[in-house]
Amino acid sequence: KAVLEAFNATEVEYKVNLTRKAAREWFSGNLSFEFNASPPQRPGRPDKPELIAPQDMPRRRNAKARAARIAMLHAIAHIELNAIDLALDIVVRFGADMPKEFTDDWIKVADDEARHFSMLNNLLIEFDSFYGAMPAHDGLWQSASTTSHDLLARLAIVPLVLEARGLDVTPAMIKK
């Protein structure tokens, strides 16, 4: 229930806090996961960012410019928010059929991604911006939807291909 509540949360800080709390409770043995809930088709999301088609995303020009840095931080924060939901979804959707260690690993992934999102969101705030200030695309979650019936496809497509590609195709990220 705690994992599903985090998945459904629509406010990002609340989602992060619920995810981190669920991880602490899971690893301290205070959370019993009964795997009797099925996740909705989409995670809870805030009203912003506006989700647009990947081909309609604005191009980032000068990576040294403040606006380009904010855009890059926002894009990475969006990937991390999706990664939280992908990890939570995989626990709820496939955990009942897997050993406990599977759930342990994916709860840890969700906790790590929540921590990463928080760090990026704090950087955005330092730049006088915030998560949701810029548009984003829904490609990661669309792939999750198409693999919702098949654990192996999900494990191959989403974390190994799309998330890595999302981080690797940015020239400034490759350089760093």
Report the location of each language-model feature.
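Non-heme di-metal
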Residues: K1-K176
